[in-house]
């Protein structure tokens, strides 16, 4: 079949002095960072949905892109053409992974049986493409939010028949992900929330989604899927309030249903800021709670209150993110998926490459600077010194439950405690970070 991106052979590393816009300037896959290849640290993935499914429409305008696979015609044939172009893109971009929703890669059809038949065909097509290209599946998921049946949610829907349809989609998408060697399976509750409490039973819906997640875990173990299950937090949009609001909320939900050892989180930068947090905060929180899994790398617009899904371009922001990830030992099954799309006015097909190349260079620089921070160790030393008192006999007795509130009160009185505030040195630390970044 004719190449779609026929003016490009493959994006390669050419160094920071290159002026070629279709080359990497900082991302060198084989460069060794802290004893590991850069590619193995970053584990880049391109997403199917924004890159090959979005037609450029927004709330005020129709599709703006002229994609051959988005024209009228046989849906299954167009899906196969889209797969051809997608894997050409993955290969030429030199990304090791990709991600998809079920209906990104396969036509939904007019019935449940058509959905199942189409997805089975396209799973075989994807398997062939993976084998031929060497590109692997980072994670799969099911779209249980776009179809009108999911207007009131999927797992939280008041109709158990809708719940059952969603269960069928997740069951099928999990099986496809396992068949394709996917390293994770993601659950995003796009409409698992409410518009108004006037028609919502919060306890009922929480019990429903809790049971749904338990069934997902049960199916994982029954089938022997070795990947990681991930929930992707988001506070709102499309619903007014969503139950997977942020990392801390997800952790509380997992604890309630006994799933905190079974499910981790896939953190998206733009979702973090919509929740009123920094991307750095959500990453650090997930690591502290032991549920860090994977990342959707993108950014929002601080002047806009919705999910703009722009490509990441802040080295400063992402250096702190990569610093946390490196300190925690790096990714295991997760990676950096670019859940990002070109702007509606970016109608040149090579804009898809420009967006991803810039994002990959951004994350590569962030990795390099984070590695410098790790190697230097000054930030960790300052933090360790700040909390050193908790390694003392008093601190350890408190943490180990060897002192009651009454005993602590007696200790403070007997030792005439008069602790003095010690500086947090925030400005000093910020200056140190800037020196890592800018010299």
UniProtKB/Swiss-Prot annotation:
Cofactor: Mg(2+)
Domain of life: Bacteria
Coiled-coil residues: none
PROSITE patterns associated with the record: XYLOSE_ISOMERASE
GO MF annotations in UniProt: magnesium ion binding; xylose isomerase activity
Listed Gene3D superfamilies: Divalent-metal-dependent TIM barrel enzymes
UniProt catalytic activity: alpha-D-xylose = alpha-D-xylulofuranose
Protein name listed in UniProt: Xylose isomerase
Native source organism of the sequence: Yersinia pestis
């Amino acid at each position: 079949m004719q190449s779609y991106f026929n003016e490009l052979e493959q994006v390669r590393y050419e160094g920071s002095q290159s002026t070629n816009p279709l080359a990497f300037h900082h991302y060198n896959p084989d460069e060794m960072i802290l004893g590991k290849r850069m590619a193995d640290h970053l584990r880049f993935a391109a997403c199917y949905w924004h890159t090959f499914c979005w037609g450029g429409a927004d709330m005020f305008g129709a599709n703006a892109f002229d994609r051959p696979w988005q024209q009228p015609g046989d849906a299954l044939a167009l899906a196969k053409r889209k797969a051809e172009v997608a894997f050409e893109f993955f290969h030429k971009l030199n990304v090791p992974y990709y991600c998809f929703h079920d209906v990104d890669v396969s036509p939904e059809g007019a019935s449940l049986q058509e959905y199942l038949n189409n997805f089975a065909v396209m799973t075989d097509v994807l398997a062939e493409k993976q084998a031929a290209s060497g590109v692997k599946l980072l994670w799969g998921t099911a779209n249980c939010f776009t179809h009108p049946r999911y207007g009131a949610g999927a797992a939280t829907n008041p109709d158990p028949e809708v719940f059952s349809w969603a269960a069928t989609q997740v069951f099928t998408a999990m099986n496809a992900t396992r068949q394709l060697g996917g390293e994770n399976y993601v659950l995003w509750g796009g409409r698992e929330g409410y518009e108004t409490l006037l028609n919502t039973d919060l306890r009922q819906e929480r019990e429903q989604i809790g049971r749904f997640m338990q069934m997902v875990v049960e199916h994982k173990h029954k089938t022997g899927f070795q990947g990681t299950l991930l929930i992707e937090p988001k506070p709102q949009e499309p619903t007014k309030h969503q139950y997977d609001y942020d990392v801390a909320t997800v952790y509380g939900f997992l604890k309630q249903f006994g799933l905190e050892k079974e499910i981790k989180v896939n953190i998206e930068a733009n979702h973090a800021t919509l929740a009123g947090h920094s991307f750095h905060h959500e990453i650090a929180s997930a690591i502290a709670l032991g549920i860090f899994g994977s990342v959707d790398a993108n950014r929002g617009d601080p002047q806009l209150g919705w999910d703009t899904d722009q490509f990441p371009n802040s080295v400063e922001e992402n250096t702190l993110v990569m610093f946390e990830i490196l300190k925690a030992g790096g990714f295991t099954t997760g990676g950096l998926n670019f859940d990002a799309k070109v702007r509606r006015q970016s109608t040149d097909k090579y804009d898809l490459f420009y967006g991803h190349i810039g994002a990959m260079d951004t994350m590569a620089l962030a990795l390099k600077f984070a590695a410098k921070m790790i190697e230097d160790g000054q930030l960790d030393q300052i933090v360790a010194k700040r909390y050193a008192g908790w390694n003392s006999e008093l601190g350890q007795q408190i943490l180990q439950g060897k002192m009651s509130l009454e005993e602590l009160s007696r200790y403070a009185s007997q030792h005439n405690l008069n602790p003095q505030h010690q500086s947090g040195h925030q400005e000093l630390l910020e200056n140190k970070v800037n020196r890592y970044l800018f010299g």
